[in-house]
From Swiss-Prot:
Site-annotated residues for Interaction with DNA: 17, 53, 55
Assembly and interaction partners: Heterotetramer composed of ParC and ParE.
Family recorded in the similarity comment: Belongs to the type II topoisomerase GyrA/ParC subunit family. ParC type 1 subfamily.
Protein name: DNA topoisomerase 4 subunit A
Gene transcribed to yield this protein: parC
Pfam family, one: DNA_topoisoIV
Site (Transition state stabilizer): 97
One Gene Ontology term of the molecular function aspect: DNA binding
Annotated source species: Cronobacter sakazakii
Annotated localization: Cell membrane
Protein's membrane topology: Peripheral membrane protein
Domain of life of the native organism: Bacteria
Active site per database record: 98 (o-(5'-phospho-dna)-tyrosine intermediate)
Amino acid sequence: MYVIMDRALPFIGDGLKPVQRRIVYAMSELGLNASAKFKKSARTVGDVLGKYHPHGDSACYEAMVLMAQPFSYRYPLVDGQGNWGAPDDPKSFAAMRYTESRLSKYSELL
């Protein structure tokens, strides 16, 4: 049972994978709620990597991109500014140094 709890499977309580939960938590700790100013995505990814998720930055940023794309999630958890991809090519997002983000109104409900 312990192995299943630490896997990258969505939790039944909120539907988030561990990396997604860490991104939302780190953004809330940075004060990036829905009414705050946008902050560079590289800052958020660096904070997540340094404190909570010691894996590659591309995996963390791709998880954040999926949470920001309105065509990937029914209720996007991240409000993004910049090039976050297109519905016909979702992998065409810009590098994290060119995008900015904050939490959406939906993520404040978590």
